[in-house]
Swiss-Prot record:
It comes from Arabidopsis thaliana. Expressed in roots, stems, leaves, young seedlings and flower buds. Detected in the embryo, but not in the endosperm. One of its GO terms (cellular component) is nucleus. This is Protein CHROMOSOME TRANSMISSION FIDELITY 7. It is found in: Nucleus; Cytoplasm. It comes from the Eukaryota.
Length: 345
């Protein structure tokens, strides 16, 4: 049988072995060359939604970075829930006037209302006072657990500074910048750890007698005879009774506001520049005890002053009514308090 044509081109065994070796070598070299220049992808394809969100986030970040230099950052702020009020023609819309303490405050303002409450309490009941170690104190059986403390120009700065606080409270009713000076003696009434009363006294040499009308004297005698005693004594124990009294115009005013004095001066030793008691403690005998203590301790020699040696500065209608009851006559001594430019502190 005739051989096929392929048989004529079939290499020998030796040549075939060599060719196979050469072919294997050439194939390994080709594989090495292909692997050296190949880029192998080792990541997995992400979802289309994730890719879009990442691209969008990157665009937003680039936009914010570009505008950060010109546009300030918007920090989140806490909401302020402010109480608003409607203006409907109220007379006290902006500021409200307290009829008891006289202070003005803005209703709805938390800080303003808090300050008013603090001032109102101090004015009505007295300034807080814890006491001092070295006190010139006076006591009375009529006022159990209460005392009067005297402060003078030679006392410590802490004592004098406290007096200045009390005087500021007194100025609400009595006016500013005239009550206190360096040569005054101050008497503080202490009750329930509060300063509820204050008397300011100064040395004087003369005063003038007040001229009172006969009608004022008759009115005073009528009130003195009709008023019951406020103290009850059981042996050595004295009880003070509180009296609730209606504040009528005739009780606080014995004249028409005009003060006329005699031209001839009378000798006097102690001038009462100002006397004040907190509103919640009035009509309890505190002002009377302050005056009695002043008479006992004002002079350095220890002698007690007579009532006729005391004089009031220009009193108000309420002060004149109190002075008439204390002295037992409407014709007591008055003097003009001078403005002395020397500070107490």
């Amino acid at each position: 049988m005739q051989a096929k044509i392929n048989s004529f081109f079939k290499p020998s065994s030796s040549s075939s072995i060599a060719a196979s070796v050469t072919t294997d070598t050439d194939d390994g070299l080709a594989v090495w060359e292909n692997n050296r220049n190949a880029i192998v992808n080792t990541y997995q394809r992400r979802s289309a939604i994730t890719e879009r969100s990442e691209v969008l986030k990157g665009c937003i970040e680039k936009t914010l970075k570009k505008g950060s230099s010109s546009v300030p950052k918007n920090h989140k702020k806490k909401r302020n829930y402010t109480q608003f009020h409607l203006e409907l023609g109220q007379s006290d819309f902006l500021l409200r006037h307290c009829a008891e303490c006289g202070a003005k405050y803005a209703p709805g303002d938390e800080l303003d209302e808090k300050n008013h409450q603090s001032f109102h309490k101090d004015y009505m009941y007295g300034l807080p006072f814890k006491g001092w170690q070295n006190e010139k104190a006076f006591t009375s059986p009529l006022f159990i657990k209460n005392r009067i403390v005297m402060v003078s120009e030679n006392d410590s700065p802490a004592h004098r500074n406290k007096v200045q606080e009390v005087v500021k409270m007194m100025e609400v009713e009595l006016g500013e910048d005239w009550i206190l000076h360096q040569h005054c003696k101050v008497y503080l009434f202490i009750s329930s750890q509060r300063i509820s009363g204050c008397l300011v006294a100064e040395p004087i040499k003369e005063a003038f007698k007040l001229i009172a009308s006969p009608d004022d004297e008759r009115q005073l005698q009528k009130e003195s005879s009709s008023s019951p005693s406020t103290s009850i004594q059981f042996g050595n124990i004295v009880l003070q009774r509180e009296v609730s009294k209606r504040c009528r115009t005739s009780d606080d005013r014995l004249d028409n506001g005009v003060i006329v004095c005699e031209e001839e001066a009378k000798p006097a030793v102690c001038g009462i520049r100002a006397i004040w008691v907190s509103p919640s403690n009035r009509r309890k005998g505190i002002a009377t005890w302050l005056l009695d203590t002043t008479r006992e301790s004002f002079c350095n020699n220890g002698c007690m002053l007579e009532k006729s040696q005391l004089a009031f500065s220009q009193p108000s209608s309420i002060g004149r009514s109190f002075g008439s009851k204390y002295f037992g006559t409407c014709s007591f001594l008055l003097y003009k308090a001078q403005l002395i430019d020397t500070h107490f502190s």
